[in-house]
Amino acid sequence: MFTLKKSLLLLFFLGTINLSLCEEERDADEEERRDDPEERAVQVEKRILPILAPLIGGLLGK
């Protein structure tokens, strides 16, 4: 039972470290994207196009 608890604790610890590293990398990527105006424009397009496509299609009668 003690070895099982030890193993679970080790897995939890390693998973926490891995999650922390992933969050740091994601935050760094987001900061980098915010600095680049071209990337920001692409992000806005990705958010707007799915909304506008059905509206335009409805107006055109498709």
UniProtKB/Swiss-Prot annotation:
Q: Is the Signal keyword given for this protein?
A: yes
PTM annotation (Leucine amide): residues: L60
The listed locations are: Secreted
Keyword Signal belongs to the record: yes
One Pfam family, short name: FSAP_sig_propep
Ranges in a coiled coil: none
Alphabetized, the UniProt keywords read: Amidation, Amphibian defense peptide, Antibiotic, Antimicrobial, Cleavage on pair of basic residues, Cytolysis, Hemolysis, Secreted, Signal
Tissues and organs where the protein is expressed, per its UniProt entry:
Expressed by the skin glands.
GO biological process terms held by the UniProt record: defense response to Gram-negative bacterium; defense response to Gram-positive bacterium; hemolysis in another organism
GO cellular component: a single term: extracellular region
Signal peptide stretch:
1-22
Q: Please, which domain of life does this record's source organism belong to?
A: Eukaryota
Give the pro-peptide residues. 23-45
Family in the record: Belongs to the frog skin active peptide (FSAP) family. Temporin subfamily.
| Described purpose of this protein according to its UniProt entry | Antimicrobial peptide. Has low activity against the Gram-positive bacterium S.aureus (MIC>100 uM) and the Gram-negative bacterium E.coli (MIC>100 uM). Has weak hemolytic activity against human erythrocytes.
**UniProt-recorded name of the protein:** Temporin-CDYb
Name the species this protein comes from: Rana dybowskii
